[in-house]
């Protein structure tokens, strides 16, 4: 009993001590709080009014872009923007007047920028003018005290070293739009951020975009920096190395000067794009700062559509280049053999309609090889009649026509390989047998992009390797990996089918065929020309002075016959005959490629072969 009473007294004693300690601590805290608020409060208010923390965004440079041989294509240059810190504004009307009158910003533009700035948040500065001149910098510096809310902010700007060269591949950057922010097209972006708008700048925007840093400084109420608090450095974006070869790209651009068309060169074995030029073009440097409304309207209203990449975003009838795919269909279906011959008199009647060959007097009796060499229409009209449109379409699709290639560039078109079902679905009309005859020589409803045609012919060159074209070679960044899904599909097509087609293509270039203007001494170039009729002969006479009625020009080929290393397609809108207009363009690309190869081999001879040589 006594023990219980003793424990009870001990408990109450400890409780009293604990309560006493709590009371003492409370009194100490209350005293300190009273001191801070009453005694020292005015001093802290004064300091808070005099000094504020300002967070300055350190914009991360985008990653650089180079060609396959490390030739720089896209870099960054130093630039300054004029920034408005809204939390530092004392007199809004005075600030607006200063920005408009002294810095030359239109009132309506400033209103838009201020409205968009509200979306970004109060403590994110509004960019009121980009990439400013020395004169603007001088004005800001001279008015620092009167307008501390206006500051200069460094920002790296995109610089495309060679102007319009490879513009459609590289693309350009621009300010993220409100719609793109709402759609989360570029996650994590805010108004004022620059993002890729086209080309690899867009496709690999995430790889190229770095991580912004920040600097925290102490500023006075008039905006003068009085102390440094902390800094987190910006992290530069990943570097891209492309598959392009600068020399081939430059040559393709020069060959297209003053023309409307495209030239694409590709490694047929793996789909690496060595050159992709489209004309007319544009200078992406004009987008590095906000492009003027006048310049933008001029670009989008240009009837030749310079922003369009004709390699992948336009589709055209393939003309006589489609005869290669017709040959593949005929051979695979067993409708062509060594003994298959057709007599060409210059014209022929099919389904009660008269169809003509391009050679009025005819080619006489021709087999498959000669029909490719001479590009005889009558042979392929007859082959089309035997095959029918469904078999023609099936083999064309198998070789990659009429569908996107999957290239790592935006805006690629499908093209069309027509069938009766397609016509019914898209036009609500019946397929006529005569349409099959037109399709058999690449006319009528069929259309392909130049890259699709190049990919299909590359499959012929490599005995059935259907590649996925791409422009990215590698990404250099610790956190990014180079895509490795450049799949190659091996087509189930007989080797003899490809051999016989290549025999005809070789003869077209090297045996007085329509592609002879692509021939290079010492190199077995294989190719096929195409000339696409834009308007009927009856109307042609009425409009003979109009350039828009001229035929489209094609040439597609590869080299060499037994060791395909490069495939080239050249296309000119309204260029005339393919053998005259397009074939010489391809020849120049082939010539540069093999000249470079010879220089490399001379500089770095094969040591193994040299060691095996005997006197």
Q: Where do the PLM segments sit?
A:
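Periplasmic/cell-envelope proteins involved in peptidoglycan metabolism and beta-lactam response
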Residues: 1-294, 303-306, 315, 337-343, ...
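Beta-lactam-recognizing serine transpeptidase/beta-lactamase-like catalytic domain environment
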Residues: 2-6, 12, 74, 219-229, ...
